[in-house]
């Protein structure tokens, strides 16, 4: 585990940095999760072992610091991650964002576009959260209510319903971080995250689990020409359910993007 000091928050973000000679991949987890919890088994697969893989715990989550005066909005997470990416001098970067980590990934790409080769999202939030989503239910509490008793209520309900993995990692979040990020999810982005995704002029791919389908986002993304991948026999928590296949699909996407870029370069040289 390593740590990165965020000056304007006087706080440390902690992360794991697995070495590799191939292009780097930065993994951004979703609400209630942590890179240190979600992606260790993914990046240990043979198909990714040559890539430099960086697993972060966002501020407020996992092993990172949990400042109470931070607003925990998507754009605020993206801002310190931009500085983090620059501090590591990352280039030719693939950014992988899951669920509510998807909007953070999208906004981060926009902030450091010249450093990013590909954006991969797994079942991302693209529009404001609606009833039925965890973030919507959490945001229905006032912040005081959630800190006083709502956080414990969500943890208990997750445990008793059998969602024990999420309960385990959620328990290491700051209640303030959970609530403020959830409220932002319900508000949506100043510019919708869907529009930001569509406007990005880089290769991008969105992954869904077969058990999550049918899904309105899948249909709309397919209709709008966004490349999609489906992993069989998994749902939303795909990195826990089948880390081997998540790794393989990620590797295949990166390889395919590289081959397309090389083909484009060779074609331009030939035409010249």
Where in this protein do the model-derived segments appear?
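Conserved alpha/beta-hydrolase catalytic His-Asp/Glu region
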Residues: 130, 134, 144-199
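Conserved catalytic-core motifs of eukaryotic protein kinase domains, centered on the activation segment
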Residues: 32, 37-39, 64-70, 130-133, ...
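Flexible "cap/lid" loop of the alpha/beta hydrolase fold
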Residues: 106-111, 116-147
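Conserved serine/cysteine hydrolase catalytic core
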Residues: 176-230, 239
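Catalytic histidine-centered segment of alpha/beta-hydrolase-like enzymes
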Residues: 234-247
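Gly/Ala-rich beta-loop-alpha elbow adjacent to hydrolase catalytic centers
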Residues: 97, 101, 105
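Active-site loop/oxyanion-hole signature of alpha/beta-hydrolase fold enzymes
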Residues: 54-96, 248
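Conserved HGGG/HGGXW glycine-rich cap/lid loop of the alpha/beta-hydrolase fold
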Residues: 9-63
